[in-house]
Structures are given as structure tokens and as C-alpha cells.
């Protein structure tokens, strides 16, 4: 007869598998580590997750995470409202902010087009983006999706649609490596890509 772990532990392992890059073995190691060596850390993690799920929402304007209705960037009167930078994730937005080269506003897609995974225009809030970009204030849309196949397809789709509405559309320059994700690229490279962006 084989021994099964307690159901509470199995449930924890399954929950940890929801994290990106965490497979069954890694989830099991993390769960055992937390229960054996860091129960205080496990409790803090649980409280932080609960607090985040209860208090974080999407900004009504740019769709990033915020605790208020409108995020800090969208509320900043020093920002240039004629520039709108489209990124895939809040992590990409933070990387661009760290370059200190961009002073416009953002729209966060919360993903990228991936038909094989069932992610279409609706799932990346395409209609909200089009409404935001067509507000009469935005003059240039900077497409800062990642240089992966899905990111390029997303940029192409968005670029075609937004150009058809008379907007100037630019794309980050290729300082970012092919297949590269902004979250993992250094700030200097991203800054150069932003400054050298090209018209689509």
C-alpha cells in the first residue's frame, strides 16, 4: 500500500503548480520546504496573496494593476497624453518606466494574441485599447509588445487596426533580441529601443 500525502499538502502542491515555470516536482519541493522550514514565510505568503486578490484591480484607463480606480501613471499631470505605449504585462510597463525615457501613458494588454491557446482580441482587451487610442487626444501609439512570435503577431494586428483609424503607430527598435521579453531585458537596451522606435 502506497502512502499518500495529507490532502492539505496535496492541495498546496496543486495550487503552487499554477505559477509559471513550476512543475509538479518543483511545486512539491516548495510545499515541503514551506511546511518544514518556513511556516512563518508560508503564512506571510498566504496573507500577501489574499491581500493582493482583495485589493488589486485594473486601472479604468490603462488596465494595469492598481489599488485605486485610476493608477499613479494615468493620474500624473506631467505625462504626455498624446503618447500611448502598448505593453503586454504590468512587468513590461515597469521595465519601460525604469528606462526613464518614456513620459507618455500606457495601455496594458494583460497578454498577447495566441489563437492556439484561445487568446484572441477579446482576451487582450482590444476594444478598450481602440477606444482609448481613438479618444482624440492620442496622436502616437508605441507598440512595445515582446519580440516573440505572438508578440510580433499582436503588434502587426494592432498596428494595422490603429493605422486604419488614422493614428501614427510606431514599434520599438530591434535593440531587444528576437524572442526577447521586455521583463528580462536590461533598462539601457529598452531605453535605446524606445528612442529608436520606428514607424509602422
Swiss-Prot record:
A zinc finger (C4-type) spans 59-74. The keyword Metal-binding applies. Belongs to the RecR family. Keywords: DNA damage, DNA recombination, DNA repair, Metal-binding, Zinc, Zinc-finger. It holds the Pfam family RecR_C. InterPro entries: DNA_Rcmb_RecR, Rcmb_RecR, Rcmb_RecR_Znf, TOPRIM_dom, TOPRIM_RecR. The gene is recR. May play a role in DNA repair. It seems to be involved in an RecBC-independent recombinational process of DNA repair. It may act with RecF and RecO. PANTHER family: RECOMBINATION PROTEIN RECR (PTHR30446:SF0). PROSITE patterns: RECR, TOPRIM. Residues 82-177 form the Toprim domain. CDD domains: TOPRIM_recR. One of its GO terms (biological process) is DNA repair. The lineage of its organism: Bacteria, Pseudomonadati, Pseudomonadota, Betaproteobacteria, Burkholderiales. This is Recombination protein RecR.
Amino acid at each position: 500500500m502506497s502512502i499518500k500525502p495529507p490532502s492539505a499538502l496535496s492541495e498546496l502542491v496543486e495550487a503552487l503548480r499554477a505559477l509559471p515555470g513550476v512543475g509538479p516536482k518543483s511545486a512539491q519541493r516548495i510545499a515541503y520546504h514551506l511546511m518544514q522550514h518556513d511556516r512563518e514565510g508560508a503564512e506571510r505568503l498566504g496573507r500577501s496573496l489574499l491581500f493582493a486578490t482583495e485589493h488589486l484591480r485594473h486601472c479604468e484607463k490603462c488596465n494595469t494593476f492598481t489599488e485605486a480606480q485610476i493608477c499613479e501613471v494615468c493620474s500624473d499631470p506631467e505625462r504626455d497624453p498624446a503618447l500611448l505605449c502598448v505593453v503586454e504585462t504590468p512587468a513590461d510597463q515597469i521595465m519601460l518606466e525604469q528606462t526613464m525615457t518614456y513620459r507618455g501613458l500606457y495601455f496594458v494588454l494583460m497578454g498577447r494574441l495566441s489563437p492556439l491557446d484561445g487568446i484572441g482580441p477579446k482576451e487582450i482587451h482590444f476594444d478598450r485599447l481602440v477606444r482609448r487610442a481613438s479618444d482624440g487626444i492620442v496622436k502616437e501609439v508605441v507598440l512595445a509588445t515582446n519580440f516573440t512570435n505572438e508578440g510580433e503577431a499582436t503588434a502587426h494586428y494592432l498596428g494595422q487596426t490603429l493605422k486604419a483609424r488614422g493614428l501614427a503607430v510606431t514599434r520599438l527598435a530591434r535593440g531587444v533580441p528576437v524572442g526577447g521579453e521586455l521583463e528580462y531585458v536590461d533598462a539601457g537596451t529598452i531605453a535605446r529601443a524606445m528612442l529608436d522606435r520606428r514607424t509602422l
